[in-house]
């Protein structure tokens, strides 16, 4: 095992704080509407220009291993806040830096780090309660647009398009972000449930202009295995033909004789059908078939539940108002499923989301919720260059997360005002001893830091602005974008409560860990001996020469 370098006490903490400061100073310049850009080097191609705190944090790796440990811990604050709330990464970094910086002074003065931690925790719990009291629901389109704009670095277009998307597909609907083809942002909305499987044969197309198969008022047959033999299908096909309605077959696969017969019947106009493969793979395929069954009011024909194709009746089939099948996608519009069953299914998937351990699983489960809950909106981000596109896309994704957070837990006045108002209510908070009181003071001091940074980045005098905002009350604050004082809510400067809460919790959590650190262990760099000159090869063809004189 390689030898380790061990640092104790103040020397360990000093190196760690140095790393914290490097990362936090790089990230905090992006805070606020007048935040500065950070240029990130790329190994090939143009550098990336960003105002996104977490993107900057992820790029930073320090040469000194002990400083790097400090930087990585603050990076964790930023990425954790981004994962939970989708925004607030820069605020969280600024808060963490302030708590660490102030806390280290008290530790150096000989105070008990554990009592400081208890004081910090006490102040955070009390602040979160105050934030809940300040919070109000975010329900109107205007408020959603304002939250989106603030999170996208004061870009009103992005806020507006997100509000439109949420209006179209509902608060629970899926909103995805893609690269656009033009210079402007565009919004595409797909009503109903969409999955990424298309027709199994182009002969099913009945709308040549759009190159799609459109089935009006069809039955939907869901089968969890492969269909090759037409004999298995005949009983169902006869019943559907009598009813005089089209049929969509969704199965693991349809091939051979079965597919050929369906195509021939379709071409001759005897029975309007279309066949598609079931979406997903393995267990996810079964779950998605079940989702489609609940959405269309049908049943998955599976041996596990005692159903076979030969015995299937019209009652086992799902129904929908309209289904469009393209080359790569199928859209089920207005399925006939009961609302109560769909709701119950959504709740069940939500429980699975909370229990999911991997991001991939969580993302797929969220997609399923959205498909069931209604509609899919696609925001196509437009830009002139690829560099601008990447930066803009990251901002749209941030804004989208922030608006979801706002809908979930409500909104508070933005621009660092909410934390200052919460701080004013905590003036009488006391700890069990003098050291805990110091811990509470650390948090109260840190809570004015986000506003200080916003003001400093806008080129104004932080102390003057902070004092003026503290003297005010309610939503009174400073709008750094315009340089005006006034009611932050009326000016449209809003923050999601969840973002502010998560930023403070994560910052305090990691900062407390640092304050209670007394030892750091790192790899010791090995001193490798300098390499000698490589041996020189002899001249070819001279092996037999006698050098004797």
Curated annotation (Swiss-Prot):
Catalytic activity: ATP + H2O + a folded polypeptide = ADP + phosphate + an unfolded polypeptide
An example molecular function term from Gene Ontology annotations: ATP binding
Enzyme nomenclature, EC number: 5.6.1.7
Subcellular location: Cytoplasm
Binding site for ATP: 30-33, 51, 87-91, 415, 479-481, 495
UniProt GO cellular component terms: cytoplasm
Keywords, sorted A to Z: ATP-binding, Chaperone, Cytoplasm, Isomerase, Nucleotide-binding
Gene Ontology BP term (one): protein refolding
Function of the protein: Together with its co-chaperonin GroES, plays an essential role in assisting protein folding. The GroEL-GroES system forms a nano-cage that allows encapsulation of the non-native substrate proteins and provides a physical environment optimized to promote and accelerate protein folding.
UniProt xrefs under PANTHER family: 60 KDA HEAT SHOCK PROTEIN, MITOCHONDRIAL
Family: Belongs to the chaperonin (HSP60) family.
Subunit field text: Forms a cylinder of 14 subunits composed of two heptameric rings stacked back-to-back. Interacts with the co-chaperonin GroES.
Protein's UniProt name: Chaperonin GroEL 1
Organism (species): Azoarcus sp. (strain BH72)
Recorded name of the encoding gene: groEL1
